[in-house]
UniProtKB/Swiss-Prot annotation:
The chain crosses the membrane at residues 20-40, 273-293, 298-318, 328-348, 373-393, 407-427, 502-522, 707-727, 738-758, 795-815, 826-846. Keywords: Autism, Autism spectrum disorder, Cell membrane, Cell projection, Disease variant, Glycoprotein, Membrane, Synapse, Transmembrane, Transmembrane helix. It comes from Homo sapiens. The gene is PTCHD1. This is Patched domain-containing protein 1. Pfam families: Patched (PF02460).
Length: 888
């Protein structure tokens, strides 16, 4: 009883609101436009988010704490040449992969000379500034001897060239660790790619060579010069490529990922304009009909204007509050399109059910009472789900900002639909009541006055006048609309046909089977190349890097951050055990081998162990570079102690798999907790992948929970709680199918796809809730009759919004960007699967599942029978229209 009272009370409130808006249409039409112009004007000076890490790396993660600890001991900016990572290397740098089209050996004489010429050209790059020209020597990272740090492969190639010049045949390159002429052992696993080896790891050939040039960025001037040097670096590599057409070069810099991420917005512009034109055309066609008076083409256009005003207002507010633009915002207009269009088409559908002899104010009040309650509840669902996503519980900034922007846009869209679109409906209502042309707004003459006009003129002015319409035909004046006619006369009878139902059920079982198959293969996508435009430096470099340099993982720093008994043999065994199985670049292991070669026991007393380490081992030229890996401290009694040290580990992998690397990280972390030696592991890529899975799923998980809670509490606002049960089951079915099919379509579970899944919850409720409500609340008659009625009442609005949404998505498929490709596939699946449920699954399943309907009992008395039929006809359509009843 309470639910019915609340339901009727809300309908009455919306009816009065509609009457009030119809009484002041000019104010409610102009106010949203003025607000949008004032707030949207600030968007002309929008700022672009520059930091990809800020957007896509989890905000709160253990890796960031570990990075701070590592930085306090061994600054990462100076160590980045040791901590190799493909796309996440910190600071400024330029990198190039050199390979051959014919898969030639890059270590032969010709290619060796070519690469050394490229190296010389890169080091001579000049960045002009007022009064000074900066070269690589001015902005490079310096070694202890004040020389620029360059990749060890450059020294290897120089030694190889000298060996050939002097006809020395004893020079050999080993892989993945080789020795230079000064005795240093260096790791070359990420500098030589596509390697073929002889016995004892001697390199026979290499298909690719990678060079990296690390730059300083210690202040703003230095950073600006380094950024310009990176741009000149790419230009130099391209010019070198043109003059040496037999080799292929893949340049990459620290700015490439950011620029290619932002490039998505630029390459999407003309496709979005095409999408807008198609949506406008389809919306106008969906609102048009042959009757030139009752046709509403302007409402189709004004519905899109309403959505545009809300989006512009939200963008202005985000900009005024200090928000910055990023390419993920491309999905916001499509979120608005799915929600806003259905609301406007539902209002138009309700308008068609009102009586034409009523005043416009009364018709508008009836429209608001009929459609605004469901639209308000679905809007509340959007606000709650996206609001949870915009909360601090969301650990990925890109997802949080997207949800925040969507929340603001949806809120203003709701207000503008109530005001701007409602007043537009009032204006078109007056045009209709005055029998004016729906496009040209001129009085339409009666058919008698058009007899002498040309056929095309009579066609343009086709209209039905009330005095020419029989009383019983008044409710059918809108049935000349193509979609209304299609649903009422053909589709409703076909989908509820007894012979069609088994095929639909079979098709649904196939749908569930394929969805389950895809669901079991869901993979998490933390690859940053999935968010950038295609045919860019990032994509080309990543493809080459995975092809030639995926044999080994990124270099993992192994940091012992407290003083331990390095001289103790049991501690030595523990440290060696922890690093066993990795390719190691370790001062500790080298020092122990050094002692063994001198026939000195590794279990020396502490003082002897430390003195020999400082005064003998680190003084040797081949081991002097290890000085950066050890931190000594003097105690009060002048005793020297090793307070912290680091080693570098590389894991052998068949392929650089993010999940495999994350599992390795978690394994090492668990080991650090239980081990006697206190250590941490770090690589810059860990900042992006640490807790990525939980951070990624949190917005979707929280949104699902909030949606369930809202459905539970909204059961008190709807007339029957069974509506919410059906909505929940439908949402589960749709989301399950979308996740499964997007996996089969090679879409990983990343930031973009998770945001689309959150939107999918709301899109499903948006389209299915009104239809389910009409079915569940129906009294008497059969389930089949009420399924047909629900489709007739709400099917047109669903079909209209679906057609507009799909034509708007189609141009998105052609955008040359991985981000928009993911966006298109997810949104298309959401729209298609929801449409499949609305027009196939639900109409069939509802015919044999609860709630049951009481069959009408026919009365023997003809007078009673006529009265009962009149009442039932009113209940079926739940409108103010009563068809002519003939009972004889």
């Amino acid at each position: 009883m309470l639910r019915q009272v609340l339901h009727r009370g809300l309908r009455t409130c919306f009816s009065r609101l509609g009457h009030f808006i119809a009484s002041h249409p000019v104010f409610f039409a102009s106010a949203p436009v003025l607000i949008s112009i004032l707030l949207g004007a600030s968007f002309s000076r929008y700022q672009v988010e520059e930091s990809v890490e800020h957007l896509l790396a989890p905000q709160h993660s253990l890796a960031k704490i570990e990075r701070n600890l590592v930085n306090s001991l061994f600054p990462v900016n100076r160590s980045k040449h040791r901590l190799y990572s493909d796309l996440q290397t910190p600071g400024r740098y330029g990198r190039v992969i050199v390979t051959s089209f014919q898969k030639a050996n890059m270590l032969d004489q010709h290619h060796t000379d070519l690469i050394l010429k490229l190296h010389a050209a890169v080091t001579k790059i000049q960045v002009p500034r007022p009064g000074f020209n900066y070269t690589f020597a001015h902005i490079c990272i310096l070694n202890n001897d004040k020389t620029c740090i360059v990749d060890d492969i450059v020294h290897v190639l120089e030694e190889l060239k000298n060996a050939r010049a002097t006809n020395r045949t004893n020079f050999a390159i080993t892989y993945p660790i080789t020795h230079l002429k000064d005795g240093r052992a260096v790791y070359n696993g990420h500098q030589l790619g596509g390697v073929t080896v002889h016995s004892k790891d001697r390199v026979k050939s290499a298909e690719a060579i990678q060079l990296t040039y690390y730059l300083q960025s210690i202040n703003s001037l230095n950073d600006m010069v380094a950024e310009r040097w990176e741009s000149s670096f790419c230009d130099t590599v391209r010019l070198f490529q043109k003059s040496n057409s037999k080799v292929k070069m893949y340049p990459y810099t620290s700015s490439s990922l950011r620029e290619d991420f932002q490039k998505t917005s630029r390459v999407s512009e003309r496709y979005l304009v095409t999408s807008l034109i198609l949506v406008v055309t389809m919306a106008i066609l969906c609102c048009s009909m042959q009757d030139c008076v009752r046709s509403k083409p302007w409402l189709g256009l004004l519905g899109l204007v309403t959505i545009s005003l809300a989006t512009l207002t939200a963008a202005g507010i985000i900009n005024l509050t200090g928000g910055k633009y990023n390419s993920t915002f491309l999905g916001v207009p499509f979120v608005m399109l799915g929600h806003g269009l259905y609301g406007t088409f539902e209002m138009l559908s309700s308008w068609r059910k009102t009586r034409e002899d009523q005043h416009v104010k009364e018709r508008t009040a009836a429209v608001y009472a009929d459609s605004m309650l469901s639209f308000s509840l679905t809007t509340a669902m959007y606000l709650v789900t996206f609001g949870i996503g915009a909360s601090p519980f969301t650990n990925i900034e890109a997802a949080r900002i997207f949800c925040c922007n969507s929340c603001i846009a949806i809120f203003f869209n709701y207000l503008y639909v109530l005001s701007f679109y409602g007043s537009s409906l009032v204006f078109t209502g007056y045009i209709e009541n005055n029998y004016q042309h729906s496009i040209f707004c001129r009085k339409v003459p009666k058919p008698e006055a058009l007899q002498e006009k040309p056929a095309w003129y009579r066609f343009l002015l086709t209209a039905r006048f009330s005095e020419d319409t029989a009383e019983g035909e008044e409710a059918n004046t809108y049935e000349s609309h193509l979609l209304v006619c299609f649903l009422k006369r053909y589709y409703c009878d076909w989908i509820t046909n007894t012979y069609v139902k088994p095929f639909v059920v079979l098709f649904y079982l196939i749908y569930i089977s394929f969805a389950l198959m895809g669901y079991l293969q869901v993979s998490e996508g933390s690859d940053l190349s999935n968010i950038v435009a295609t045919a860019t430096q990032t994509i080309e470099y990543t493809t080459a890097q995975q092809k030639y340099f995926s044999n080994y993982s990124p270099v993992i720093g192994f940091y012992i951050y407290e003083s331990i008994e390095y001289w103790n043999t049991s501690v030595q065994e523990d440290v060696l055990e922890y690093t066993k199985g990795f390719v190691r670049i370790s001062w500790f292991e080298s020092y122990l081998n050094y002692l063994r070669k001198l026939n000195v026991s590794t279990g020396l007393p502490k003082k002897n162990f430390t003195d020999m380490l400082r005064n003998s081992f680190l003084k040797a030229p081949q081991f002097s570079h290890f000085q950066e890996d050890i931190i000594f401290s003097k105690k009060y009694n002048d005793e020297v102690d090793v307070v912290a040290s680091r080693m570098f580990l590389v894991a052998k992998t068949m392929e650089t798999n993010r999940e495999e690397l994350y599992d390795l990280l978690e394994t090492l972390r668990r080991l650090s907790v239980t081990s006697k030696v206190k250590f941490i592991v770090f690589n810059p890529s860990f900042v992006y992948m640490d807790r990525y899975a939980s951070s990624l799923g949190a917005p979707l998980h929280n949104s699902c929970i909030s949606a369930l809670f809202l459905l539970f509490f909204s059961a008190f606002l709807v007339a029957d709680s069974l509506i919410n049960v059906w909505i929940t089951l439908t949402v589960v079915s749709v989301e399950f199918g979308v996740i499964g099919f997007m996996t089969l379509w090679k879409v990983e579970l990343d930031c973009i796809s998770v945001l689309c899944l959150i939107y999918g919850i709301n899109y499903t409720i948006d389209n299915c809730a009104p239809m389910l409500s009409t079915f569940v609340l129906g009294k008497d008659f059969t389930r089949t009759k009420w399924v047909k009625n629900a489709l007739e009442v709400h099917g047109v609005a669903i079909l209209q919004s679906y057609l507009c949404y799909i034509v708007g998505l189609i141009p998105l498929a052609a955008v040359p960007s991985n981000l928009t490709c993911t966006l298109f596939r997810c949104l298309f699946l959401i729209a298609f699967v929801t449409f499949f449920h609305c027009f196939a699954i639900l109409p069939v399943i509802l015919t044999f599942l609860p709630p049951s309907k009481k069959k009408r009992k026919e009365k023997k008395n003809p007078e009673n029978r006529e009265e009962i039929e009149c009442v039932e006809m009113v209940d079926i359509d739940s409108t103010r229209v009563v068809d002519q009843i003939t009972t004889v």
